């Protein structure tokens, strides 16, 4: 089973956003999300939380491509919103800036269908080596 199917079958947010994985290679990821009215705020522009969630997925996939541990979690995510986004589909690219033993730093860009930069982010993902993060008792 490929990564696209694994995430669609095991991550409800990934499935809700209709994320499509376009590319994943060491230190890099590229995903796409559609424009949907359900994702928009007043004025029919993409909601900032949707943008941040897509950015988190792209950064997480870039991290996964270099993760030599068992699991990972987002430790920090800083997003600068530059332009309102309403021309989908949207592409989100994550590039690993630095990989350490316990942390991976990723720069992420969010663009519209015309290539216009709508948001830029810098995130830190914590590498977990001894367990998988899950709900207690579940």
UniProtKB/Swiss-Prot annotation:
Disulfide bonds: none annotated. InterPro entries: ACOT13, HotDog_dom_sf, PAAI_dom, Thioestr_dom. The keyword Hydrolase applies. The keyword Protease does not apply. Gene3D superfamilies: Hotdog Thioesterase. CDD domains: PaaI_thioesterase (cd03443). Pfam families: 4HBT. GO terms for molecular function: fatty acyl-CoA hydrolase activity. Its EC number is 3.1.2.-. It comes from the Archaea. This is Putative esterase STK_00610. It comes from Sulfurisphaera tokodaii (strain DSM 16993 / JCM 10545 / NBRC 100140 / 7) (Sulfolobus tokodaii).
